[in-house]
């Protein structure tokens, strides 16, 4: 039967060639669009998880209630003990602390006087601990446009738009002005290790990255963390597994009335991710459905 159909197509090209070409092109378009949409979603989930949310996230209840403000005065104290419990109960997950905060970055001239100042948003991650995957997770090696990644305490990475606007170069000494978790003024000097470009306007406009040990000294947050991120094995987000871990952890804390007790969320709970991914999946389905109807 198959041989008969092939002979018919070859011998009568005027009738068979156009349908074959149309169907072939249609299948290619469907496969391409499906792969494109899937790739875009995977990239969005990966970027959001690595920089903003994690696959899982632990914070205090008070912090979670005002999470958008990143209120470090409501941060998780005794984060080392909490992480020990997390590693013990969910050993397959890579747990790592993060701190988000803002301040002013002061750039001096050759005489040590202030040449320029600009507001920055800082993210502190565990970049120097042995075995930490944070530098790779944030893609720092690929993002470096000048200088090098953080290799020792007292170093900082500056986003490219900020660096170009204020003339910051690798090797420069800068001063960060901010406030401690208790509201007191604080400042610290850092050496600019490198300039980074992430290809994301929000990150590139005025972001800095430093090691979490330096941030804890600056913010007077010894053994504290604003948030603890959790990443599932293989850095691959699995909604059902993440939901199971979240439910298990929150069940353990259900009888604790303290507003500073830890609470866990997962990626789909954050920043309208569930609605965004659901909408995108629906759009992808309808696009493919329309193409299939048009080709039938």
Where are these regions (language model features)?
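A short beta-strand structural signal in non-transmembrane regions
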Residues: 56, 162-163, 224-246, 262
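Structural beta->alpha junctions
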Residues: 66-67, 197-199, 230-239, 267-270
